[in-house]
Each structure stands twice: as C-alpha cells, then as structure tokens.
Amino acid sequence: MKQSSVVDLLLLLLAIALLATPAFSDLVLSKVERRIDVTSQIARVTKTLKVVNSGSESVSEFALTFPKFLGNNLAYLSVAPSEGKGKSKRTLVNLSVREADQKGLPDSISVYSVALPKPLSKGDTLTLEVVAAFTNVLQPFPEKITQGEIHLVMLQESAQYLSPYAVESQSLSIKLPNARIESYTKFENTKLQGSELKYGPYKNLQSYSYSPIVVHFESKAAFAVAEKLVREIEVSHWGNVQVTENYNVVHRGAQLKGEFSRLDFQARPNPRGASAFRHLLARLPPRAHSIYYRDDIGNISTSEMKSDSKKTELLIEPRFPLFGGWKTFFTIGYGLPLTDFLFASEGKRFLNISFGSPILDLVTEKLIVQVVLPEGSKDISVTTPFAVKQSQEIKYSHLDIAGRPVVVLEKNNVVPDHNQHIQVYYKFSNINLLSEPLMLISGFFILFITCIIYTRADISISKSSPSYLAKLQWDEVLATLQEVQSIVQKCLATHDKLEASLRDLSRTGDIQTCKAARKSTDSLLKDLSKELKPLLGFLQSFPSASHISPKVEELVVKEKELQEKLMAKHTTVVEGYEKKSSGRDIENRIASQQQKIIALRQEIEDLLEFIDEI
C-alpha cells in the first residue's frame, strides 16, 4: 500500500493549498448533486449545480474547478442550463466553456470559465448540468496480475465538491460495476448500497473544500484504447459514402504477469481470463452495408452483425483475447447511402456525419478523420461542436486529374461523448459529375480509333528505302550462316561415324567393313565441301558480312584440316591391323594425330558458338 500512502500525501497537500485560495465571486451553490459512473474505463461525472447570486453585482461567468490530476485527463466537458424539475426537466443548449487564467491560483487545480446565457443578477438562481468525461483516472492496482486474478482498479476523488464558491448542500454517488469492493474511504454519512457508494449530504462547505477519497474495486470493463485511429470518409456523388477505419488497439488494464495458457482460458474463460476482453461492439448507422472486418493476415470471420431499422451492430472479435499490455491491429469498413448523410443548403452541399469511432466505450489517444470530397469541390469549410486541428490535403485516385480535396481533422484524447455530428460544407458543380464518365468514353473512343488506324494503315517500311534493303541483306546473311552451320554440323557427324568404324574394327577385326565405311565417309565429305564453296562466295559479296566472313573461312579451313587428320588416323589404324601390329603399337603411332584432332574439334566448336551468337 506504499502507492496509496503517496497518493494520500499528495491529496493532503492539495487540500492545504486550496484552503489558502480566495473565492471567485459572491456566487453560492445552494445545492450540488454529483454522480460518478465508473462502470467502464471512462469516469463520467454528471453534476447538477444550483447557482445563487448572493452579491450585489451581476455575474456573467461561472468557474468550474478540478484537481490537477483530473484536469490533465479531462477528455470531454459540457455545461448547459436546465429548466423545470423531475420529468418536466429539460436541458438547453450547451454554454461556451474555456480554460480560465490560472493567475493567483495554485498549480494543483484546473479552472474552466463558463459564459452564462445572461448575467445573473442579485438574488437570481440558475441550474447548470455539467457533464465531464475523464480518461486514465481508473488506475490498475495492482499494475500486474496473472491470468487467473481479478482486475482491480483505483479511483481517486473528493467526497466534497471542489469549487471556488461556498456550497450549502452537496452529495456524491459513485456507480460501480458491481458490488465487489476491496476498500473505500469512509467519512460521516458514507453509505454502500449494492454497487453504489454514497457520500453526504454535507452542509455549509467553504469554498475549495476538499476531502480526498480512494475507492478500490473490481472492474470487468474492456480497457480498450486506440493508440491511433484513422477514419477515412470518402464521398461519391454516385450514391455512396465509403468509411474505412484503421485501428491500433491496446489493452490498458493491468498487465499480464506470467505465461498465457490457451487451454485454461478455453476451459474456464471467466475465472481464467477475467481481465481480458474478447470482443468489441461497434454501433454503425442503420443502413450500413458492404461491411468488412480484417487485419494484416486477411478477413476475420469471427465477427457477427445484427441490424434493424434503428442501428447496425457489428460484434468485433479479434483473433486472440487481449490481456493487459497486448495489442491488435485491424480495419473495419462499410458503405453508407449518400441520401442519409449528404444535404444541400444555401447553394452548398454539406456532409453531416459522426466524428468519433462507432466502437462503444473506446478511448482514442489520437484520432485522424480524413474526409475525401469529390474532385472539383471548392469553398470548403467545416463545423465541429468542439475544437479540432484542421488541415487540407490532395488525394489522387482513379481517373483524377487535379486530385480530390481531403479535409483532415485531428483530436487527441477522444471518448464516445465526442461521437457527435460534424458538417463539411463545399460547393460542387453537377458538370463535374460527368468528367470521369466522359474521360472513360474518350479513352475507349481513342483506343477504338487507334485500332482502326493500325489495322487499315500500311505502316511497313518502304521496299526501296536503304534501311529496308539493308534489312533484307542482313536476313540473307543470317540465312547463309545457318546453312554453313548446318553443313559443318553434318561434317562433324560424318567424322563421328568414321571414328565409330575404327571402334568397330578394334572390336571385330573386320578390315573390309572399316574400309567400306571409309569410302562412304570420304564421298559424303566431298559432297558437303562442294556445298560450302558457293556459300562462302555469297557471304564475301555482302559488305554487311565483312566482319563475319573471316570467321566462317577459318571454320571451313579448320574443318578441312580436321578431315585430313581423321583420314590419316584411319589409314594408320587400318594398316596396323593389316600388318597385325599390337594395339599398343597402333595407339603409339596415332597418339600425336589424336591430340591434334581433339584440338581442332574444340576450335571448330568455339567458332560454331561464335556464329550462333550472331
């Protein structure tokens, strides 16, 4: 409980500082009713303040104060006057609220100034309804828990209403998620009834009265926080508004300590996964369609959708349960009918659509809303019910020329209370609707005309032009080279047959068959040589083949030399067999010839490869 002691000390110092702070004016709060709802991760505070002017001068502003640790986490604040009582009570339009000057006030408080609808004269009364939403004020305690432990959080507040005005009567009620409370600060007139904790009523409190309280209780709420959410709203005047939302969600509750057991979680999900959340609920507009839910892996089929005439609910279930500190990334998208959200007013069109996330009880640390308007939109303006950072960009899509204007709205610390409608006004000419269809028609027309011209026009090169004649000559050169290659390959194949006859001779000893093979080979090689002569002359007649002819001539010479060496080898082997020489003696006699044959064969192969590359 060391952390609790430090908190108590800080709250005590705050109370001491407040006692020395002067009152703002002669206003008196005759009755204060505060209600704090902590059933979700967001602490929602509702206050009913009955204000009386007990001074002699009129007052036009009213001050709201919060402890600094609450003011730093204030996400939403609205103040509105109310009239009537009970069922006839009605709340009027919200008043203007701004941060007040802290001059003369301690740093331990945050002050906001509310502009009253009209000056409050002496003796007049006014009832104000204040709604405030705070994030990060429900602190997990302990900060780390195991999978099987319950999730406990701690709330710090004041039993007495912190105000720069004297309070005649005030009460506080805290609505808890359930009746399981570990501990709470006890004062006079403190009562616990089920899941509701009540303090007061307390009478005749001085200005800046402060009595710190700490409530330690169980919370099963989903502490889902979107570290970043990008909502892209694309408007198409052809009948659709497409919404795409990219979420980066983290569980900001007590972090998981130890290992996660999927088996225990599946068998006993309630006691073994009480601190985790398994799904989120998104409440979409009633006529949403074409809904999808996916992540980086692909479509997630575990989502469920229910729809009726008033709403469409999408139950988002991540691929795994989220414990404290765990993150997930996903995208949801849906289409909306244009007629439900796009309207016309005073010569302008305006988009009327919600600002925040449709996911219930989601806290968004950074929200970026990108409204993509049709190409040609101009005179763009935005109306929002609260302050946001605005900028404009250009986005290029299919068939765009100048690009589509994009209105970018940014806001930090966003809660569901911010899910109010914004209006994006712009001017757009109906003629621009025809730009993309006309572009498509023009593209197909140009393609059609091009095809007609291509099929009917003679785009071949003139047969009398030098380039055409040079191409013809080069084609003839290439054809001649292919013939030379073919003849030389036939010669090499004939050489192989001659070598094969020698191998048969060594195996069978049939000299006559070997001589017959020699005679057939000799006749075939002579015929092939005759075919080569006119081809060489033909190549030499073309100037374009001047760099090739020497290689071809060298190829023919090498092949002729190879023929002679093979014939000499063949003669030597046959004579050896006729004289009945030994095999070793014959091999010794042809050894030098064989080396030359191998070298010539390799040179011929290299020349053929060179010609083939041409």
Curated annotation (Swiss-Prot):
GO terms for biological process: protein N-linked glycosylation. Keywords: Endoplasmic reticulum, Glycoprotein, Isopeptide bond, Membrane, Signal, Transmembrane, Transmembrane helix, Ubl conjugation. Residues 454-614 are cytoplasmic. Pathway: Protein modification; protein glycosylation. There is a cross-link at K311 (Glycyl lysine isopeptide (Lys-Gly) (interchain with G-Cter in ubiquitin)). Glycans are attached at N94, N299, N352. One of its GO terms (cellular component) is mitochondrion. Residues 1-25 form the signal peptide. It is a single-pass type I membrane protein. Pfam families: Ribophorin_I. The chain crosses the membrane at residues 433-453. Coiled coil: none annotated. Residues 26-432 are lumenal. It is found in: Endoplasmic reticulum membrane. Belongs to the OST1 family. Component of the oligosaccharyltransferase (OST) complex. Subunit of the oligosaccharyl transferase (OST) complex that catalyzes the initial transfer of a defined glycan (Glc(3)Man(9)GlcNAc(2) in eukaryotes) from the lipid carrier dolichol-pyrophosphate to an asparagine residue within an Asn-X-Ser/Thr consensus motif in nascent polypeptide chains, the first step in protein N-glycosylation. N-glycosylation occurs cotranslationally and the complex associates with the Sec61 complex at the channel-forming translocon complex that mediates protein translocation across the endoplasmic reticulum (ER). All subunits are required for a maximal enzyme activity. This is Dolichyl-diphosphooligosaccharide--protein glycosyltransferase subunit 1A. It comes from Arabidopsis thaliana (Mouse-ear cress). The lineage of its organism: Eukaryota, Viridiplantae, Streptophyta, Embryophyta, Tracheophyta. The gene is OST1A.
